C-alpha cells in the first residue's frame, strides 16, 4: 500500500469543481539498476522519503533485502518493504509514459539533456497530468550503459566539479527528489 503525497500543482489549472489538481507521489518511480552495495539502497530509500517519494523499483540488486539497507534507511523501512524487484529495466518502467535516466559520464552519443532543476519541473508537470514517470539510476561503479540509456526519453545530469563529477547514488537521488519537491511548492 503506497501513501500519497498530495500537493497543489502550480502548473495545472483547477479541476471543473474548482478544486486544485494534485500530485500523487506514487506516479514517480525511482529505479535503481544493478545496485552493488545494499547500504546504497537504504540510503536512497531515506533520500526519497525525506522528499515525499516512496515508490522504489530495484533491477537485479546484488543483495536485497539486507540488514545494511535497513540500517542506512533511517526511518524509511516502509520504502524498502514496498520496493519491487525486477529482472529488467523494461519490466520496471513498463507502466511509465516518460522515462528519465541519470549519468555522470560524457557520452559519444547525444541524448536530450536536462539539469536536475529542469527535469524536476518537467517531471512535476507530467505528474500533474497523471502521467507516470520513471527515473533510472545506474550501477554505482559504472552508471548506465548506452543501451540502458536508450530506454529513456531524456537524460538528467547534475553539474559537479569537473575534476571529480561523480556523486554517490543516494546523493544524486536526494538532489533530484529535492528538486521535484521544490518544483511542487
Q: Which sequence ranges carry the predicted segments?
A:
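Post-transcriptional modification and biogenesis factors for structured RNAs
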Residues: 10, 14-185
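Histidine-centered nuclease catalytic patch
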Residues: 1-7, 16
Amino acid at each position: 500500500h503506497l501513501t500519497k503525497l498530495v500537493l497543489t500543482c502550480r502548473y495545472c489549472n483547477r479541476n471543473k469543481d474548482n478544486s486544485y489538481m494534485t500530485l500523487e507521489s506514487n506516479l514517480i518511480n525511482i529505479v535503481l539498476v544493478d545496485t552493488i552495495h545494499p547500504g546504497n539502497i537504504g540510503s536512497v530509500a531515506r533520500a526519497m522519503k525525506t522528499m515525499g517519494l516512496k515508490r522504489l523499483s530495484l533491477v537485479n540488486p546484488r543483495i536485497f533485502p539486507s540488514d545494511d539497507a535497513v540500517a542506512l534507511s533511517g526511518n524509511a523501512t516502509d520504502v524498502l518493504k514496498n520496493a519491487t524487484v525486477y529482472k529488467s529495466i523494461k519490466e520496471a518502467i513498463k507502466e511509465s509514459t516518460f522515462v528519465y535516466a541519470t549519468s555522470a559520464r560524457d557520452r559519444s552519443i547525444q541524448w536530450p539533456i536536462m539539469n536536475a532543476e529542469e527535469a524536476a519541473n518537467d517531471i512535476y508537470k507530467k505528474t500533474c497530468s497523471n502521467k507516470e514517470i520513471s527515473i533510472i539510476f545506474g550501477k554505482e561503479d559504472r552508471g548506465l550503459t548506452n543501451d540502458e540509456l536508450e530506454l529513456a526519453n531524456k537524460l538528467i545530469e547534475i553539474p559537479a566539479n569537473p575534476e571529480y563529477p561523480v556523486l554517490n547514488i543516494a546523493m544524486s537521488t536526494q538532489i533530484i527528489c529535492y528538486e521535484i519537491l521544490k518544483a511542487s511548492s
